[in-house]
Amino acid sequence: MMVLAAAAMAGSVSLAMAQAAPATQTATPPAQTPQTTTTPATSDLPDAPSTSANVKAPAVPTGPTAVIDTSMGRITCQLYDKLAPIAAANFEGLADGSKDWIDATTQKKIHGQPFYNGTTFHRVIPGFMIQGGDRLGTGMGDAGYYFNNETDPSLTFDVPGRLAMANAGLGPNGTGTNGSQFFITEAPQPSLDGGYTIFGQCDEHSVLIVASIARVDRDSNDKPNTPVTINRIYILRNGDKPPAEPAASPATDHLVVHPGTTAPPQ
């Protein structure tokens, strides 16, 4: 099953809390005779480090914009085509039909047909993420191929709205298991850093939609009881204007005005 191997996954992987080791007591060093020192000249002193030296500059997405029209509203994300070129190009190709894929049911090669249209978010967890990209809707489907992770130290799960590839860890030959499934985070998830390829960033309004989808009624496997459908994904390039947003299904009972940032249930 294509899952997120993270602490937030209800009913699967529990959080392994790191416990600090007790401090080791050491003997007090013997007293030493103080030595006379001279104050160095100002010109010999090193430059004071900048107060911003350790501040990480945020990664800026520079690629196309993915407009994901769902049955509960529109999600808009810009892709990191420079930091995750393989994942970004893969998502673009599956979304607009320019990339071939294998039908998981018939095992036939599909050409020129968008992969994601009509699929659902098959796994949703409040405070954590929503997961989609499986035409089977079971968490077991893919596009008939896999590729390795693309991780960059400047791109972490430190903010809400990260668009990332779902995977099942390493394959039997030590290769990656990224394919078609993806997820979008509702809140920062540092426990996922380094294990999943981030290839896009969704805007603030989209995070509200993600939070609303994450709170629909769902079963014990976190699958929505009423399907939340991806109607279509548009890839906008070179200043393309987004199409008019279609009317979404009523979801006022689940609308989240301020998404929570609590840790996912264990």
What are these model-predicted stretches?
Residues M2, L15-Q266:
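Cyclophilin-like peptidyl-prolyl cis-trans isomerases
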Residues M1-A7:
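NTP-dependent nucleotidyl-transfer catalytic core
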Residues A7-M17:
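Hydrophobic h-region of N-terminal signal peptides that target proteins for export
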